[in-house]
Regions:
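The feature captures the ABC ATPase H-loop/switch
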Residues: 129
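Conserved G/P- and acidic residue-centered "switch" motifs that form tight phosphate/ATP-binding loops
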Residues: 126
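N-terminal beta1-alpha1 cap of cysteine-dependent amidohydrolase-like domains
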Residues: 1-123, 133-141, 145-146
Length: 146
């Protein structure tokens, strides 16, 4: 695992560390589902951004998005091994493009819409960028080689 260097001393503005939300994926460990965020994203927020990472569980409508976002200073829309479900951008789902994470989709798309409308800074990586595109009405190519 490559190390993420921390910010140089004195390069972060004074005051409390920013709270940065990281949406979680749901993955099964045997029969039990777990909410997970990749270590590289957690470390990047903590070290490179000198922030405090806050996992956002994929609980869909159980999360009050405006309330959550009023407490966060930004969002990092993380990458994931899963793909955005093709139903969300007008395509057909296939086993070839699995896995999908419908709970994450149902959480992140409203999260993005609320963050954008409330002016909360958002940084998107890989799957997160695909979610941003779909949340704004865009489409995706399920496989670039097609």
């Amino acid at each position: 695992m490559s190390e993420i260097p921390p910010l140089p001393p004195g390069s972060r503005p004074p005051g409390p560390k920013p709270l940065i939300g990281l949406p979680a994926c749901i993955w099964a460990e045997g029969e039990h589902p777990f909410h997970k965020v990749g270590d590289k994203y957690v470390r990047a927020v903590a070290l490179a951004a000198a922030g405090t990472p806050v996992m956002i569980p994929s609980l869909q409508t159980l999360i009050d998005m405006p309330d959550l976002l009023s407490r966060l200073d930004g969002i990092v829309m993380t990458g994931s091994p899963s793909n955005v479900h093709p139903d969300l951008y007008g395509q057909l789902a296939t086993e070839e493009h699995e896995p999908y994470d419908p709970a994450r989709d149902a959480t992140t798309l409203p999260l993005i819409a609320t963050a954008l409308s409330d002016g909360v800074p958002l940084f998107a990586i890989c799957r997160g960028f695909q979610e941003l595109n779909v949340a704004l009405g865009g489409s995706l190519h399920a496989a670039m080689h097609d």
